[in-house]
From Swiss-Prot:
Signal sequence extent: none
Pfam families (UniProt xref): Pribosyltran
Residues in coiled coil: none
E.C. no: 2.4.2.7
UniProt GO BP: adenine salvage; AMP salvage; purine ribonucleoside salvage
Major subcellular site: cytoplasm
Pathway noted in the entry: Purine metabolism; AMP biosynthesis via salvage pathway; AMP from adenine: step 1/1
Subunit and partners: Homodimer.
InterPro entries cross-referenced by the UniProt entry: Ade_phspho_trans, PRibTrfase_dom, PRTase-like, UPRTase/APRTase
Record's protein name: Adenine phosphoribosyltransferase
Domain of life: Bacteria
Localization (cell): Cytoplasm
Length: 182
């Protein structure tokens, strides 16, 4: 498969000073507005995981849902949703974490995974790693393991990918940006 990181990067819109001054937000919605780019992103992930040994797709609220749901369908895997606090209706497990903007809680239905399950976690971007680390902790609390954490974008200067690697969780991203890239 041919993958061009430049094409992907050119369709990720930088939004300066959002959600707060000094932050450059990486907006992936232009990728989803281009059928060719969307197919390239999803096919790249599907190609990586089609023969991998894992049982579930884990998708992070909210943009990770866009990736995870398509891949769960393509790869015929159960989808586990990791939601912001108060969004799930049944019994949940919760995990607190720090974000680049403050503190939050991540929740998952307590019956989503069983001992021995293996999860590929998806989000749109890895910044500090807070969301994915919280999800990994929830996965492990249910007796399952993390196969890999994946995202479209890595912001390596914020250290999230390294934090995940330090926990024994491999990471995979389609592209990366320096914090000052516009």
């Amino acid at each position: 498969m041919v993958f061009d990181s430049f094409d992907i990067k050119s369709l990720i819109r930088p939004v300066i000073d959002f959600p707060k001054p000094g932050v450059i937000f990486r907006d992936i919605t232009p990728l989803f507005q281009s059928p060719k780019a969307l197919r390239l992103v999803m096919d790249s992930f599907a190609h990586r995981y089609v023969e991998a040994d894992f049982t579930h797709i884990g998708a992070m609220d909210a943009r990770g849902f866009l990736i995870g749901s398509v891949l769960a369908y393509q790869l015929n895997k159960p989808l586990v949703l990791f939601r912001k606090q108060g969004k799930l209706p049944a019994d949940v497990l919760a995990e607190g974490y720090a974000t680049e903007y403050g503190e939050a809680f991540l929740e998952v239905h307590a019956d989503s995974l069983c001992e021995g399950d293996s999860v590929v976690m998806f989000d749109d971007l890895i910044a500090t790693g807070g969301t994915l680390i919280a999800a990994a902790n929830l996965i492990r609390r249910m007796g399952a393991r993390v196969h890999e954490a994946a995202a479209i974008i890595d912001l390596p200067e914020l250290g999230g990918s390294q934090r995940l690697e330090d926990m024994g969780i491999p990471t995979f991203c389609l592209t990366q940006f320096a914090l000052t890239d516009k």
